[in-house]
Every structure is written in C-alpha cells, then in structure tokens.
C-alpha cells in the first residue's frame, strides 16, 4: 500500500483513495485503453492533465480486466477459426487451446449444487408456505407459521409428502433456488441468522401473539428492529474477524510501503521474475511484466531485426533503437533518450539518493541501481559469458566483459585519444591524467556515446565463437 497524501492530485483516479501505489504513464497503453473503454476516463490525455495514480485495489482490478480482455480476444480468434473450418476436418481442440495460450478444457466442480433431493424439496415447501418479508403481512400470520412448522415436520418424516405434486417440481427449478440461496448467503456480511435463531424466533411468535402490525413504509422489511436485536451479538463477532483480517493485510503490505520522501523502507520485499531475473515492488507489477514481456502472441514484428512485440505502441518505441533519434532530452545534462520512461529513470540520478540498501546502508538514486548493488553482497553470478564461461554479478559488468571480447572501445578520451571499454574507466583516466582539463569540463555536456546493447553483444560474441570452432 502507498503512503496517504493530502494532495488530491495524487489520489487514486478511480476511487479517490489516498494510498496510491502506481502511476499510469503514456507507455501503459493497455491500462489507458481499458480504463477509457470501461469507465470513459481518459488518463494521461487531459489538458491540463489530472491525476493518473491508482491504488493497489484498482490496479489489481484493471490488471484482471486486461487479462480477461486478452483471453476474450484469444477465444474469439479460436471461434473464427472453427467457424471457417470444414465439418469433416478433425481438430485437436486441446492443442488448439494451447496454441492460443488457453488452459486445457476443465469442468468446474460446484459442490454447492450437489444437494440431496430431500433437502431441496423440503426447502421448496418452506419457500411456498412462508410469506416473504418484503410483502405486507397477512392477519393470520401466526396460524400460517404453525402450518409451516407442521409441513416441515411432515416433510422430514413422511415420505408421501415428498411424492406430492408440490414436491415434484422439476429438479432444475429446485437447483436454481438453491443456487440463489447460496449466493445470497455468501454475499451477506452482517445479518447472518443461524437456524437456531430462526427456530427461537418462531417459538416466540407461537407463544406470544403480537397485535396486528402497523402499516410501514414501502420496501422496509417487517420486524427489522427485532431482527437487528437478534443478530446484534453476531454483528459484534462478525466485525472482529474483518478488523483482524484488515490489520493482518496492513501488516503484510506495510513492508512494501514507501517513506514520505519516496524512498523505500529497509524491509522491502522483491518479487523476481524467474525468466529474466528482473525484480518488482509488488506481485501485480510482476504479473503485468510476465503478461507483457513473456506471455501471449507477439504479432508485431520489427522490419530491421525481426523482434516480435505484443502491441503497436511497443513496436514504434522499439524502432527508435535502430535510429539515431533521441527525442527526450534531459534538462540537466542534455543527455538524449529514446522515450520518456528512460528519461524519467535517468532524471532520478540527478537527485538525492533515496533507496537504501538494507545490508550495508548505502543509499542509491534509483531502484534499478539498488537492485544491481544488492548482488555485491552475494556470491551469485547470474550472467554467464558464452565465450569463456566466466560469470558476472550484473548485466553492466557482463556488457563491459563482452566489449573486451569484441575488442570494441567506444569510450574515448578527448584529450589524448585513449579508448576504453567502460565510461567509468574513461572518467577515471581523465581525472588522473588530465585533472586540470577535467575540472573545466562542462557538466551539462552529454558524455554518452552509442554502444551496442547486451543482446547485440551476445550475438556478436556468439558468431565469434562459431567462427573459431570452424
């Protein structure tokens, strides 16, 4: 859960809660599309822009809507394929479902529908004889209650009653009534009277006959005050588990809460992706990452490198990688970036360190840097070199290592022309060999140079290894 705030611009855009955990951005096209389609709320598109924050509850609901929408699209594609297939064609339906990312066919076991016929018929007799509380009571209500009890006793003891025309109503209707009763019992949270309470109420009505009730307002149930007194003790006990459950939930989510300055507490919990080892702050963020990056068909293919992407927006953003265009410029150091998301992450490096390591206490500017730093305290080397087999603790170290295999030295000292594989070594060289010139450098001047990505370096070194084997 997020930290409550009094600034309304940071409230949840859908429910106005102040404990927000997620900010909707322009690149979250699925979120923006679903919210616009279902609720007619144009997030990130207003002029002037309103708040685009979501609380954990709303973010979870929208995530389920996105997943359900994708599932519906897959199902419609399957139906279109089956509709245009010939009747004599044999289709492996299970394989077809798996091809479109759907689980194998399964039947849901509804236990509450497996009810004894005797119980169904007895409950039907009870429904037919007891008048509804929402209707105005008849004058002979007490006599009708006595008849109801007699009918119930006869239903439980005499098998002839079960064979009567009243009890021989089709089984479908009885199951439907039982299903409605089950849904009503499950949805009720406050007024849950037990069978013993109902029997006591009937006995009280038999012993003391109340005067004819006064005419009440329309829609108000008869005996609401009495029902409230009967269930008063149950209400007290029923609220206690809710409070306990809420306190447990708060304790569980407090570990993920952030400080008022935006920094994460030392007791943070990471949710790692088992496929790419990227970590996330919440389970919902991890699930969305798996859905966007590792799940579903990738129908948009890049013309330059053949990479498949799930959305057209992702394709347009990816195609910037193959160009020199960097439309997003940092106002502090004039560094250029392909999209606003990378610029937003980079802008955090110019601020005060906010993310604290819970092992050594070191503070870092961004969460990504913190995640890389945490592997300093472990012996795990997840990133392996395919050429020499050596391991690195993070992707940056592997990238520098692969640059050494390729012989590329993209970082060049502008004072003496010496080239380096990493920008850190280049900056260190400037301060050691050219301290006077380095101190006069313009800090706003961008020092970034085009460097191959980690995937491109892996492809280059893989081809080099094949060439050596041949």
Curated annotation (Swiss-Prot):
Q: Where is the composition biased (Polar residues)?
A: 255-265
| Bias kind Basic and acidic residues: ranges | 237-254
Positions contributing to Zn(2+) binding: 12, 15, 55, 58
Which keywords are on file for this protein?
Answer: Cell membrane, Developmental protein, Membrane, Metal-binding, Phosphoprotein, Repeat, Zinc, Zinc-finger
Q: What is its main location?
A: membrane
Provide the residue span(s) of the region labelled Required for homodimerization: 1-103
Recorded hits in Pfam families, A to Z, give: zf-AD (PF07776), zf-C2H2 (PF00096), zf-C2H2_6 (PF13912)
Entry-linked SMART domains = zf-AD, ZnF_C2H2
Q: Could you identify this protein by its name?
A: Zinc finger protein weckle
Question: Which species is this UniProt entry from?
Answer: Drosophila melanogaster (Fruit fly)
